[in-house]
Amino acid sequence: MNFKAIILAAGKGTRMKSKYPKVIHKVCGKEMVNHIIDVSKKSGVKDTVVILGHEADVVKEKLAEEIIIAMQTEQLGTGHAVKMAKEYINDEDTIVVLCGDTPLIKEETLKRLFEYHIENKYHATVLTTRVGNPTGYGRIIRDKKGDLLKIVEQKDANSEEKMISEINSGIYCFNGKSLREALDLLNNNNSQGEYYLTDTAKIMRDKGLKVGAFAGSTIEELMGVNSRVELSKAEEIMRRRINESHMVNGVTIIDTNSTYIESDVMIGNDTIIYPGVMLQGKTRIGSDCIIGMNSSITNSEIGDGTEIKNSTIIDSKVGENSTVGPYAYLRPKSDLGNNVKIGDFVEVKNAIIEDGSKASHLSYIGDAHVGKNVNIGCGVVFVNYDGKNKFKSIVKDNAFIGSNSNLVAPVVVEEKGYIATGSTITHDVPDGALAIARERQVIKEGWVEKKNQKDDQSK
């Protein structure tokens, strides 16, 4: 069975009050249209066609290369939109039509829709739900056997039909051959002058084909996002789902209301997440980690047993059983090994720091390779920029960099090299050598008294 998705994403979304197309607004770090694409793939869809219109190039930039694009230059209704993808619909396909602004649809729901459609040998199946207040929605009218008779829009419903609580979700499953034939018979003979996809069900039924409705979803899951208020609601629901999913899988989240975890983040079991944490992008957190209050980690990998304390980590890697923070900043391309300590107010950028090394306080380590078991004292600066170019420094295994020292790149400190406190190092340091690069202390006895006398005389 070849499942293919057609995603309707051509609309402008004027109620969003945005210069950007509606479907690329993000929910928990991912564009709405990409949520739909990912969920459809997980449900078994092999190929995806996205119908674009308004600001098509902007949307296309956010889509993976394998996504098929079909254009709807004029927005003439949902049926017209699907017509634009007709060349990609094969007779043997099972087609699911989805809306690009419904990011909360679940993989399990689509799988059940497919199963229901196939088991009942329907040519078209609409996904439905029942609500307490159906006002504004298209009503599902079933025949005596429970099959779909028709879909009646709110404005066309009579008083009896308005009492029906089962509503149309806007998500459909079709037999490919039947859909192609029905699209050819669509017309726009209605008050809006549009081609409605819902009319395909009636066309199929009039031809004697079996069509159905699957009441297998919830109004929350089917919520469309048309405004910033609805975007916020979708974000809240998605965030709750994500947090609950991690907790079910063995992660402790102290305060779910203040914890923000994006949809592609992965976390190992027995990790504890404290309040105020933000985990974004493709971040991977290992098992038995502690992610402390107000830490922000983006597109980074954290090894098992590591503790992050109130720190910011971006596009970096931290090994196992290491500690970072409090108030540390790992900028892009920081790569820390196992059992590494990066302490308070230490900044690391584009640097490798190997196993067992530590920089406990107030240091800047940029464009560097630090070996194993190196001690970097308080106030050490890797001076990497001459105003035009950046250079790299290398500190090899078991070296000791004394407090308040400057390593002026490019410079190499060989194994067991020892830098005296307060030194400014501009030349390589040999293996096992002590480097002292500072003025010798001078004591001038009685200097203060002489200075005071001179100051008094000048008054």
From Swiss-Prot:
Instruction: List locations, semicolon-separated.
Output: Cytoplasm
Q: Which GO terms describe its biological process?
A: cell morphogenesis; cell wall organization; lipid A biosynthetic process; peptidoglycan biosynthetic process; regulation of cell shape; UDP-N-acetylglucosamine biosynthetic process
Q: Does the keyword Signal apply?
A: no
Q: Which residues bind UDP-N-acetyl-alpha-D-glucosamine?
A: 8-11, 22, 72, 77-78, 138, 153, 168, 226, 331, 349, 364, 375
Q: Which GO terms describe its cellular component?
A: cytoplasm; membrane
Which residue ranges does the record annotate as region Pyrophosphorylase?
A: 1-228
Reactions this protein catalyses: alpha-D-glucosamine 1-phosphate + acetyl-CoA = N-acetyl-alpha-D-glucosamine 1-phosphate + CoA + H(+); N-acetyl-alpha-D-glucosamine 1-phosphate + UTP + H(+) = UDP-N-acetyl-alpha-D-glucosamine + diphosphate
Give the pathway listed in the UniProt entry for this protein: Nucleotide-sugar biosynthesis; UDP-N-acetyl-alpha-D-glucosamine biosynthesis; N-acetyl-alpha-D-glucosamine 1-phosphate from alpha-D-glucosamine 6-phosphate (route II): step 2/2; Nucleotide-sugar biosynthesis; UDP-N-acetyl-alpha-D-glucosamine biosynthesis; UDP-N-acetyl-alpha-D-glucosamine from N-acetyl-alpha-D-glucosamine 1-phosphate: step 1/1; Bacterial outer membrane biogenesis; LPS lipid A biosynthesis
Necessary cofactors: Mg(2+)
Which SUPFAM superfamilies does this UniProt record tie to the protein?
Answer: Nucleotide-diphospho-sugar transferases, Trimeric LpxA-like enzymes
N-acetyltransferase: annotated segments: 250-459
Chain spans, region Linker: 229-249
List, from the UniProt record, the residues annotated as the active site of this protein: H361 (proton acceptor)
What does the protein in this record do? Catalyzes the last two sequential reactions in the de novo biosynthetic pathway for UDP-N-acetylglucosamine (UDP-GlcNAc). The C-terminal domain catalyzes the transfer of acetyl group from acetyl coenzyme A to glucosamine-1-phosphate (GlcN-1-P) to produce N-acetylglucosamine-1-phosphate (GlcNAc-1-P), which is converted into UDP-GlcNAc by the transfer of uridine 5-monophosphate (from uridine 5-triphosphate), a reaction catalyzed by the N-terminal domain.
Q: What's the subunit arrangement here? A: Homotrimer.
Q: Which family does it belong to?
A: In the N-terminal section; belongs to the N-acetylglucosamine-1-phosphate uridyltransferase family. In the C-terminal section; belongs to the transferase hexapeptide repeat family.
Q: What is this protein called?
A: Bifunctional protein GlmU
Phylogenetic classification of the source organism:
Bacteria, Bacillati, Bacillota, Clostridia, Peptostreptococcales
